[in-house]
Amino acid sequence: VELIGLLALSILLGLRHGIDLDHVAALADITGGSSGSKKERMKLSLWYAGGHEAVVFVLGCSILVFAWSVPIWADQWMGKAVGITLIFMAILILIGRRNGNGAYWSRGIAIFQKLRRRNGEPFTFTRRNVFTVGVIHGIGAETPTQLLLFTTVAGVAATNHGMLAVAAFSIGLLLSHAIIAIVSIWFHDLAKKVRPLLPVTMYAACLFSFVLGVSYLLE
């Protein structure tokens, strides 16, 4: 009974952690790309989620097995790095970058296009780079729900039960990310149908990312 309660709590914490603002901003960016089908954008979102969830699982297990977690100073710097990234991507969309078809690039596509080019072609999202972004977000900016999970598993006597709790948290997190991705894809596509050359959701996401990035820097 205690194990079932622990797993249920972990899943709920994972669902709650999945709707943290930095996750929403990242998934809105990935799903807001002007190219790619719904299926392709959903796959990329799941790769981002996979990177994030993998880090959470490793960190949780490291607490159980080695009694080790990310140092406070490292977590603070990673949080600020996330903030800088969000601000930089928001500024890029504001300068009105366009692709060859006249549609606006998403913030993430714009930043990757500016930082790197492959074979002369604009650099866009791939499984590898969205997975990497997920890993970075998993390390930085630990939230109360994530810290509560780590505190809970640290107090579990049986290591295998603690690992099950971390796995349950990751499952809840994955479900939350999947739902956000589906909703985000739907909103972006709806906005493109209404105003193809000026999708409102892109600019709303841009403002959201900028404000969120500033808040991370001020923490």
Explain the meaning of each model-derived region:
Residues 95-138, 193-196:
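Alpha-helical multi-pass membrane helix bundles of inner-membrane/thylakoid proteins
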Residues 32, 60-85, 95-100, 152-163, ...:
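Transmembrane-helix boundary and interhelical-loop signature of multi-pass inner-membrane proteins
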Residues 2-71, 147-163, 187-188:
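Juxtamembrane transmembrane-helix termini in multi-pass membrane transport proteins
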Residues 20-23, 52, 87, 142, ...:
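Divalent metal-coordination and catalytic microenvironments
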Residues 14-22, 137-143, 177-179:
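Short helix-coil transition sites and intra-membrane helix breaks within transmembrane domains
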Residues 13, 44-48, 52, 133, ...:
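Alpha-helical transmembrane segments of multi-pass membrane proteins, especially transporters
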Residues 56, 131-133, 137-148, 205-209:
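Core segments of transmembrane alpha-helices
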Residues 5, 39-116:
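Membrane helix-loop-helix hairpins that form the core translocation module of multi-pass transporters
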